Amino acid sequence: MAPQTLLPVLVLCVLLLQAQGGYRDKKRMQKTQLSPEIKVCQQQPKLYLCKHLCESHRDCQANNICCSTYCGNVCMSIL
């Protein structure tokens, strides 16, 4: 392939990647967005809770809810 055609092909590839949503992984972007059922926690969690992350209320034990904090989504007691 001639050197003059390499640059247009490269530009075309970059433009196609941007049209598809860029370089970011769509699943990673979906995880960073809050689920409609997960709300911001009312209180600051204890530091040990940051080791036990959750994705939904089903991941938590009884009398606990999954809520969003500075360290991610954690299970916190509702009592």
UniProtKB/Swiss-Prot annotation:
**One BP annotation, GO:** innate immune response
Q: Which organism is it from?
A: Homo sapiens
Q: What is this protein called?
A: WAP four-disulfide core domain protein 10A
Where on the tree of life does the source sit, at the highest rank? Eukaryota
Q: What is the annotated localization of this protein? A: Secreted
| GO MF, any single term | serine-type endopeptidase inhibitor activity
The record ties this protein, via InterPro entries, to: Elafin-like_sf, WAP_dom
Primary gene name? WFDC10A
One of the record's GO cellular component terms: extracellular space
| Residues making up the signal peptide according to the UniProt record | 1-21
